[in-house]
Amino acid sequence: MIALIQRVSEASVTVEGEMTGAIGQGLLVLLGVEQGDDEAKADKLLHKVSGYRIFSDENGKMNLNVSQAGGGLLVVSQFTLAADTNKGMRPSFSGGAHPVEAERLYDYFVAQAAASGIPTATGRFAADMKVALVNDGPVTFWLQV
């Protein structure tokens, strides 16, 4: 399971002209589900995402996690993160989880995030989405479990 996280001042996602989710300060989480992923991997990745200390403390040092910074999560499904780009000029998505399983684990990740007390907003699984964000930094990390 993969999360590409970006520290943002604000972010939103729109599907078919309707805003489905928005946050102020926090993390935009692009979430990719791979073959073989399960709830244990989702839990491990959420623990890493929610605990990752990439927000500045009072001394300007990256020392706070998203909760400590008073931020939220905007979780957006992103199957292209599971792409194999090693050969040719066209990505292969054979490493991605089957859509039914990917949606189940995406929903699980989102539910666990919300249950943890972090304000959590979402896009719509497998939809054509428009994501708007204001990067803060920019600060971007690839987390994979």
Swiss-Prot record:
Catalytic activity: glycyl-tRNA(Ala) + H2O = tRNA(Ala) + glycine + H(+); a D-aminoacyl-tRNA + H2O = a tRNA + a D-alpha-amino acid + H(+)
Motif interval(s): Gly-cisPro motif, important for rejection of L-amino acids: 137-138
Any single Pfam family the record assigns to this protein: Tyr_Deacylase
Places the protein is found: Cytoplasm
UniProt cross-references to Gene3D superfamilies, sorted A to Z: D-tyrosyl-tRNA(Tyr) deacylase
InterPro entries: Daa-tRNA_deacyls_DTD (IPR003732), DTD-like_sf (IPR023509)
Keywords, ordered alphabetically: Cytoplasm, Hydrolase, RNA-binding, tRNA-binding
Disulfide bonds: none
GO biological process: D-amino acid catabolic process
CDD domains: Dtyr_deacylase (cd00563)
The enzyme's E.C. designation: 3.1.1.96
GO molecular function, one term: Gly-tRNA(Ala) deacylase activity
GO cellular component, one term: cytoplasm
Domain notes: A Gly-cisPro motif from one monomer fits into the active site of the other monomer to allow specific chiral rejection of L-amino acids.
HAMAP family the record matches: Deacylase_Dtd
Function text: An aminoacyl-tRNA editing enzyme that deacylates mischarged D-aminoacyl-tRNAs. Also deacylates mischarged glycyl-tRNA(Ala), protecting cells against glycine mischarging by AlaRS. Acts via tRNA-based rather than protein-based catalysis; rejects L-amino acids rather than detecting D-amino acids in the active site. By recycling D-aminoacyl-tRNA to D-amino acids and free tRNA molecules, this enzyme counteracts the toxicity associated with the formation of D-aminoacyl-tRNA entities in vivo and helps enforce protein L-homochirality.
Subunit architecture: Homodimer.
NCBIfam families cross-referenced by the UniProt entry: D-aminoacyl-tRNA deacylase (TIGR00256)
Family from the record: Belongs to the DTD family.
The name this protein goes by in its record: D-aminoacyl-tRNA deacylase
Organism: Aeromonas hydrophila subsp. hydrophila (strain ATCC 7966 / DSM 30187 / BCRC 13018 / CCUG 14551 / JCM 1027 / KCTC 2358 / NCIMB 9240 / NCTC 8049)
Classification of source organism: Bacteria, Pseudomonadati, Pseudomonadota, Gammaproteobacteria, Aeromonadales
